[in-house]
Amino acid sequence: MALNSITYQKCFHTSAQQYADNKNKKVIIGMSGGVDSSVSAFILQQQGYQVEGLFMKNWEEDDDTDYCTAAADLADAQNVADRLGIKLHKINFAAEYWDNVFEHFLAEYQAGRTPNPDILCNKEIKFKAFLEYAAEDLGADYIATGHYVRRSADNENAQLLRGLDANKDQSYFLYTLSNQQVAKSLFPVGEIEKPMVRQIATDLGLVTAKKKDSTGICFIGERKFKEFLARFLPAQPGDISTVEGEIVGRHDGLMYYTLGQRKGLGIGGVKGLSEDPFYVVEKDLVNNVLIVAQGHDNSALLSTGLIANQLHWVDRKTIGDTLRCTVKTRYRQTDIACLVEPIDAENIRVIFDEPQIAVTPGQSAVFYQGEVCLGGGVIEAQLK
């Protein structure tokens, strides 16, 4: 398929006037060595922008040779930059990542919650440290990333929108952005679908064309999670108990489990109980007990709502009254119709139209009205 085909032109479409205006604007694209940022850089070029790349190293791997991916990712990013004829800057944000993301990540696990480091990483690194560095040190008018999201406008009222590809939409991870940050950010692949991204990369002959998507912890990579966490937090094994109080096994440490988890519990057949699988329904931090229940539809797994705090609204306005909208309590979840009620300036109560399974403290509740991501908060507690 030729890169000047009608199909591709839909990806790159820019009016003659906009193209001329773009030629005076500098964009720094965060290049991770993946296919999404690679194609994003190319699309920006086609839209007329002055494009330069930035590779961020945010994890020191001196003692981590088994999982050293940063060098390979940098090589891929440099290869793509050379292929596209753009400059690639390098920056080390490891100190910022440790102080502002990873220490919080550990503290949340230690407190028995299940955090989402990608959300905090976007807040503190990609759209704070990166944005500030690009603007102040590199003279950027915009930054760009390979996230599958869109924005509504190029001004202070910019809204964050879901990505065009519903299967890849990443707005859940970006709800902490303000409309000012959205206005200063470009998301080229948010306007197209993933198969087209890979097709463009293939036709360009980019080394990242067939590179698999990363699924590990933000910037740290794909590791054996239990072994990795044990290096930083001492495990405290304890009992696994049913909601009725019967001991049915031993756990390796509460931090290794999340609500709704079924696999990896190590509970065999228990005399007097059915063969239905066990699910984690609660963590008793005081007594170091993991509480389980049988059956996917067990009422112990269900929540009628949640309490959330650490709120971030994209327009940075607080909710003054009740709000009808939809919510996601985890990535890739189907939207849940709900009512949001302000408790005070820092806390909200969310009531689901239908009870939901495995609402997990530490994860984020992200709110939507149609295509617009309104913002969200961190789940503090379930409502039963």
Curated annotation (Swiss-Prot):
Residues 116-118 are annotated as: Interaction with target base in tRNA. InterPro entries: MnmA-like (IPR004506), MnmA-like_C (IPR046885), MnmA-like_central (IPR046884), MnmA-like_central_sf (IPR023382), Rossmann-like_a/b/a_fold (IPR014729). It is found in: Cytoplasm. Keywords: ATP-binding, Cytoplasm, Disulfide bond, Nucleotide-binding, RNA-binding, Transferase, tRNA processing, tRNA-binding. The keyword tRNA-binding applies. The active site is at C121, C218. It catalyses: S-sulfanyl-L-cysteinyl-[protein] + uridine(34) in tRNA + AH2 + ATP = 2-thiouridine(34) in tRNA + L-cysteinyl-[protein] + A + AMP + diphosphate + H(+). The gene is mnmA. One of its GO terms (biological process) is tRNA wobble position uridine thiolation. Residues 168-170, 330-331 are annotated as: Interaction with tRNA. GO terms for cellular component: cytoplasm. Disulfide bonds join C121-C218. Its EC number is 2.8.1.13. This is tRNA-specific 2-thiouridylase MnmA. SUPFAM superfamilies: Adenine nucleotide alpha hydrolases-like (SSF52402). PANTHER family: MITOCHONDRIAL TRNA-SPECIFIC 2-THIOURIDYLASE 1, TRNA 5-METHYLAMINOMETHYL-2-THIOURIDYLATE -METHYLTRANSFERASE. It comes from Haemophilus ducreyi (strain 35000HP / ATCC 700724). ATP binds at G30, M31, S32, G33, G34, V35, D36, S37, M56, G146. The record marks H147, Q363 as: Interaction with tRNA. Catalyzes the 2-thiolation of uridine at the wobble position (U34) of tRNA, leading to the formation of s(2)U34. GO terms for molecular function: ATP binding; tRNA binding; tRNA-uridine 2-sulfurtransferase activity. Belongs to the MnmA/TRMU family.
